[in-house]
Each structure stands twice: as C-alpha cells, then as structure tokens.
Amino acid sequence: MANFDLTRINCQFLDRHLTFPLLEFLCGKEIYNQQELLEYILETVNKTNMIDYTMDTRKRLNLSQEMPDELVQRKAEVLATLKQLQNEVAPIMKATDILKNGESMKDSKTFVNALQKDYNFKVEHLESAYKLAKYLYECGNYQESTSYLYFCLIVMSPNDKNYLNVLWGKLAAEILTLNWNTALEDLTRLRDYIDSANFSTIQALQQRTWLIHWSVLVFFNHPKGRDLIIEMFLYKPLYLNAIQTMCPHIMRYLATAVVINRTRRNALKDLIKVIQQESYTYRDPITEFLECLYVNFDFEGARLKLHECQTVILNDFFIVACLNEFVEDARLMIFETFCRIHQCITISMLADKLNMKPNEAECWIVNLIRNARLNAKIDSKLGHVVMGTQPLSPYQQLVEKIDSLSMRSEHLAGLIERKSKQNNKESIDSWKYY
C-alpha cells in the first residue's frame, strides 16, 4: 500500500525531530525497504545533535559497533557547547522558583519586573535562554527544553524576532513529550498568533500549512481533538483554503475524524462537498468510501473501499489507533444509509454489505438496538430486520444550522478584514504622494 502512504509528503511539513516517530513506525511495516529506510533515518539524525540515536541507528545498519572518531569529536563538542550555554544562563537559574509561581503573576511585565529586581535579569539572559532551549531540543532533551521555552514565552514580547520560533519549538517539544493538554494550548496560541500577524499572503499560507500538519498529531491524541479538527479544518475558511491549495491529502484525516465522531454527523454534508471539489487533486480509499456511500449510493463499492481503508489506516502513523473505531463507525454508516432506502432488510444481505458473517451481523444489530442507537426490530424466524423511523433530533438540527452560520460569518469577516487592509494600504500609498 505504498501508493497510499503519506509519510513522505507529511514529513515535508514537519520539523526534523517530529519525523522520527513516523519513520520508526514505518520500520515496523513492510511498505519500504528496511535498509533504505534506516539509511534515511541515519542521514536525518546526523543533522541533529542526537549522538546516541545516531549510534543506535548505525548499529541497526550493522555498521561499526564502536563510535567513529568523528562522532566522538562531535559528542565532545556538543557537551562543551551545552556546558557553555548553561553557564550563560546560570544567573537566572535561581529564578525557577518564581517561574513555578508564574501563574500568580498578573502579566509578563510583572514577571519581568520581579526578575529584574530580584535576579538582576538582563536582555542578554533571555537570548541565552533561547539558545539553550534550542540546543537542548537539538540534542533530543525535549522535556528540559520546554522549561526554557516556557520561560521565553513569559518574558518575550510578541514583537521579539524569536517569538514565533519559540511558539513552534514549544509546540514541537510538547508533542514529542506527549503532553497533549499543553500541546493543545500551544497549538491554539500559535494559531492565534499566525491569524493575527502581519504576514504576506504567501507567508500566512505557508505557516498555516505547517500548522495543519503539526495539529493532526495533537488532534488524534487529545480527547477533544475529534471535534477541534473538524472545527479547524472544515469550518475555518482560512485553513480549509490552505488544505485545498497546499495539502489536499489532509482530507484523509478530516474524513477519518468525521467518520469516528458520531456526534458530528451533521458535518458529513459539508465534508462530502469538499471531497467532491477536491476529488481531481486527491483521492484515497477513505475519501472514496464516503463518495461511494453518500454520493453514488454504491454499497458494494463502499464495502470494497472499507476493506482498503483498513490497510491504509493500519499503515498511517497519525490514525492507526483509530482502526477498530473507524471500522465500527463505517459499518454503522453503511447500515444507516442502507436503512434509509430499505425498510425491511434481510440479515444475510446486511452481512454481505458489512463484510461480516450472518451471525456476527445479527449480534451487531442486536447490540445497536440494545444500546438505544437503533430503532428497529429483528424477526429471527424470517431473518429480517424491520426498521422504525429515524427522526433527526432538534439538537442535531440546531448544531447543523449553527455550524453553517458560523462558517458563513467567518468567511464574511475574512472578506471584510481583507477589504479593510486593502483600503488602508491604498490610503497609505496615496499619502506618500503628498
């Protein structure tokens, strides 16, 4: 299934360190040549200061078991540089106590004043803290790096030349240490900064494209992520536009989120529209499954695509944990769509559509009825399932209306903002001539 593997594309939009989990995941699969994959990992890790990881990869490639002189020298240089940077930051090391109580500070200005008063804090110390945080990150010491990055975020002005780098670094470090709650906070902070910054159109598009890829790692690991990925990718026009323009392959992850999120079935209609619009630039078994089911009502095609979906998800680092849930919810979607067309269905027919044995299909339907998720009755003698009415709840109707209005409002707000910026620019340009 290498033709459906997105690792190569996704890695283009990820920090070097964020690619390592994806590449190591592929090592456990039989998609690519193991030797070539390890050689690529070695080539990538050589660009970092992770000497131990480099040696480990060399051993896996059956290279020399002893550390080459070049690596010995590099390790010594890394340790020396690290010690030098730590010495530069030493004057503010005692500020860790006040940093722990940072939440009690009203704002960053209060915090900086306290640092200047109690610890003789200077601007040079901030630059040193930033360099040390970056160096620790390059060495793979992500946990310690987050402490200094957090310090920089509190002390730095948003206008600082390194502020955006700190935001990206903090998000990457939190992802790599699996701190999903903090990562989500950093993701939101970074998104707000990008959306409000005075970037050019191209710069903003590039920043959002990178953020989209990084956010997938957070959304599929955070309890609230399944709702948030739909809100950001489908109902925020700026990000939907970035997906359609720069990375239509992200449709795989948006589609997966909608399938496994039963409370957001109202998003299906909007998702299908986008899938149809982008079908000429990107298609995979997951998007084709939804097309078969909701556009063509091709149940046989949907059944076959669902089988392919399982292989795709099994080999995708971002969504592999969703495999069982995806299959279960996809079967439910096939079942619900089939039931809208047929009021009386044979269990054998359903089993065929769901890729299940008849007795498994019957048990599956019984569990749906038992859990109050299906208004139906089973006639065991005839082997029939008789469907009741499935009314759309007022709550679902309200949510659908709100989502639609929210998307339109945000789109209009974006148009007004762009028009305002254009008018202001014309006004400034006109002023230059007088």
Curated annotation (Swiss-Prot):
The lineage of its organism: Eukaryota, Metazoa, Ecdysozoa, Arthropoda, Hexapoda. Keywords: Cytoplasm, Initiation factor, Protein biosynthesis. InterPro entries: eIF3e, eIF3e_N, PCI_dom, WH_DNA-bd_sf. One of its GO terms (molecular function) is translation initiation factor activity. SMART domains: eIF3_N (SM01186), PINT (SM00088). Component of the eukaryotic translation initiation factor 3 (eIF-3) complex. The eIF-3 complex interacts with pix. Interacts with mxt. It is found in: Cytoplasm. This is Eukaryotic translation initiation factor 3 subunit E. GO terms for biological process: formation of cytoplasmic translation initiation complex.
